[in-house]
Amino acid sequence: DVCDSLVDGRCIHNGCYCERDAPNGNCCNTDGCTARWWCPGTKWD
């Protein structure tokens, strides 16, 4: 899945904290950062 938006443009996905305005524009999933938003870490953070 991609992230689900929760609060103020932030989202959480499987323990991953994501930010809309982060440089890469995507979010970590099981294979790395391939979903819509970026996250500073991994799925298992």
Curated annotation (Swiss-Prot):
The modification 4-hydroxyproline is found at P23, P40. It is found in: Secreted. Keywords: Bromination, Disulfide bond, Hydroxylation, Ion channel impairing toxin, Neurotoxin, Secreted, Toxin. It comes from the Eukaryota. Disulfide bonds join C3-C16, C11-C28, C18-C33, C27-C39. Expressed by the venom duct. The modification 6'-bromotryptophan is found at W37, W38, W44. The keyword Signal does not apply. GO terms for cellular component: extracellular region. One of its GO terms (molecular function) is ion channel regulator activity. Mu-conotoxins block voltage-gated sodium channels. This toxin reversibly blocks voltage-gated sodium channel in cephalopods, with no alteration in the voltage dependence of sodium conductance or on the kinetics of inactivation. The cysteine framework is XII (C-C-C-C-CC-C-C). This is Mu-conotoxin-like Cal 12.1.2b. It comes from Californiconus californicus. The lineage of its organism: Eukaryota, Metazoa, Spiralia, Lophotrochozoa, Mollusca.
